[in-house]
Curated annotation (Swiss-Prot):
The active site is a conserved redox-active cysteine residue, the peroxidatic cysteine (C(P)), which makes the nucleophilic attack on the peroxide substrate. The peroxide oxidizes the C(P)-SH to cysteine sulfenic acid (C(P)-SOH), which then reacts with another cysteine residue, the resolving cysteine (C(R)), to form a disulfide bridge. The disulfide is subsequently reduced by an appropriate electron donor to complete the catalytic cycle. In this typical 2-Cys peroxiredoxin, C(R) is provided by the other dimeric subunit to form an intersubunit disulfide. This is Alkyl hydroperoxide reductase C. One of its GO terms (cellular component) is cytosol. It comes from Staphylococcus epidermidis (strain ATCC 12228 / FDA PCI 1200). It comes from the Bacteria. Homodimer; disulfide-linked, upon oxidation. 5 homodimers assemble to form a ring-like decamer. The gene is ahpC. Its EC number is 1.11.1.26.
Length: 189
């Protein structure tokens, strides 16, 4: 089931905040009023996951400039996130909150739970300030994601929100032309 254009479901979870080195509660209400990226991954202390989360950290400053909050989520607890942060060179660089979802509530809400393993699939979601999913990417377990493409997707989502009636074509970049769908454009692209 696609979550595009759907409001995220309610949840309450504990997260590890590496910036403050503390645990905190996170709910769907924390997503309201700003853009958010939620990056699901299978497990702490694994192999592809730290490379993805470090790559996301490498884009963190750009995401912050765009007013985007970043959250990673796995079915591990927030305690395990803290231990991983304290022991992994890649994960020790993270500045964004790491949500623990041992109840699998959030993972189920976003429809990325692998029922057989009980782990999250590799899913990335862009959520607008109204708490509505605007973009989603889900990869097979062995395929890591590229966070640099995420920045441009967010810019496109923000542009479309600010310019109703316009759409961003493939490979759209900030400053390039958008399209205004209409009868005069049919068959001319």
């Amino acid at each position: 089931m696609s979550l595009i254009n759907k409001e995220i479901l309610p949840f309450t979870a504990q997260a590890y905040d590496p910036k403050k080195d503390e645990f905190k509660e996170v709910t769907q209400e924390d997503f309201k009023g700003s853009w958010n990226v939620v990056c699901f991954y299978p497990a702490d202390f694994s192999f592809v996951c730290p490379t993805e989360l470090e790559d996301l950290q490498n884009q963190y400053a750009k995401l912050q400039e765009l007013g985007v909050n970043v959250y990673s989520v796995s079915t591990d607890t927030h305690f395990v996130h803290k231990a991983w942060h304290d022991h992994s060179d890649a994960i020790s660089k993270l500045e964004y909150s790491m949500i623990g979802d041992p109840s699998q509530t959030i993972t189920r809400n976003f429809d990325v739970l692998d029922e057989e393993s009980g782990l999250a699939q590799r899913g990335t979601f862009i959520i607008d300030p109204d708490g509505v999913v605007q973009a989603a990417e889900i990869n097979a377990d062995g395929i890591g994601r590229d966070a640099s493409t995420l920045v441009n997707k967010i810019k496109a989502a923000q542009y479309v929100r600010q310019h109703p009636g316009e759409v961003c074509p493939a490979k759209w970049e900030e400053g390039s032309e958008s399209l205004q769908p209409g009868l005069d454009l049919v068959g001319k692209i």
